[in-house]
């Protein structure tokens, strides 16, 4: 109640302010009850008071959790919106962030809280009007009784926690992945239809892709095969680059320039290296390109290398399924208004591979052409743009939970406000 009175002096009116007036009306009515020997409205007021205290506790817990997340942070990354990013949709991209992005917005009242304040003020004025009219007709005692009763009836008790409860539940979930939302402005900015770019390090962080072994075919020397294939993979980019660069270093071979590079988009790439046509890709890709594959070379996850139309090597690759990446991708694919856009340079990350690896439905995942990918990768958020959410970990699940959680919070808070307005 003191918070409510303090808000009035600051030029704001909220549910706690209405609760303070309700307390005064109930106290005056209780004094009349002693004289008239009737039961006051103490039970109903105690229920509203309990809910108001619960809302304050939840808000306090949310703020402490957010501060604790930022306190433990080593590096901050922000989620910023870029207009007209892909297919007419804005993009939610990650960039640098500062603590001020959160501190400037976290204490601002949200849209549901503003609606609550307007509703509380209107309810107070209407209740006073009804009480004055009743007092003029039936006396002051009945007017006070009607004022106290109408104020209690005007606001459902659960209205106090219609926003703070969903926010507290979401904060606990975000705290586990090291993420905070930048106030209601961040919630609004993360809502609506948007594209979410996914890079190689999002799906398979550094160290999750390893070389399990290699088998060479034909008469070419292994060093020559490694040099040609590694050069082509370096030109393609992606998570395989560190693996093959380490292989080149171990064999003490040099990288060569690549000409006529081409990404076929079906799990394979090609180009000319030292005047030799080189093809790299999955087993099905090389077979479709007319390369003869000997029997007994069936490997589930492998890069097949063909030079001048002849199979020269099979590199067995291990893609470790990280729980954070899997949880983030599943979460993004579960929201219709979010469109994941694959910007990975790794040609092995095809639609079929992602479906089998992560068990997600890929019909909503977009696989743009190489030219479009390069254009999107070069787009950077405005340095002056405020961050909508801040993540403290380099994990896909941290950003994904912020996006989907903000949408769920806005829906829950809006629905709760509408229901309580109708109920009041």
Q: Each PLM stretch: what is its role?
A:
Residues 250-354:
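Signature of the cytosolic headpiece of P-type E1-E2 ATPases
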Residues 2-7:
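C-terminal ends of transmembrane helices
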Residues 9-20:
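Cytoplasmic-side transmembrane-helix entry/capping segments in multi-pass membrane proteins
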Residues 186-213:
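Asp-based phosphoryl-transfer active-site loop
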